[in-house]
Amino acid sequence: EQLTQAGWHVCDRQDIDLVNQYGNAVREVIMDAGHGRADYLLYVDKRAVGVIEAKPSGTTLTGVHWQSAMYAAGLPEAYRATAVLKDDRLPFIFEASGTETHYTNGFDPNPRTRKIFNFPQPETLARIARDAEANPDAPTWRARVHNMPPYDNYDLRPASKVAVGAIEASLSAQQHSR
């Protein structure tokens, strides 16, 4: 239901429609040998971009990331030619339980699981993937923060200079929750 509300076409493998549906969430896709079966394989722009590991409502998602990461690394060869890959794996990894959703963006400099409140729309993942392909050295906001040029000291008061410096250092060190 959350996927449908976000604009995804949720379907079985035989019902996938890459032509008329922009974002497809395909149920129960068998991954490469030893990588199991992904609950959902996500497609945008006719390309595989991510996986979802779905758990029963109320299940804690702590410790589930290894499973969805295994799916992201196990995309079958037949899908790889057109897939969006980062370090030989799908970049967008989700775990969901109906009450909480975790998300990992593989394009981030130090990818890690983050709690999100809603599934992103297909257009959002497509934009992130396009931005990453267009600028591989700084594919995401977090990567661009790491590469910020030093700010000119302009005409700031001393306390403002300290505050701006502290904010930039915090962002660069990823000391933020979103």
Model-derived features: where do they sit?
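ATP-dependent helicase/translocase motor core
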Residues: E1-R178
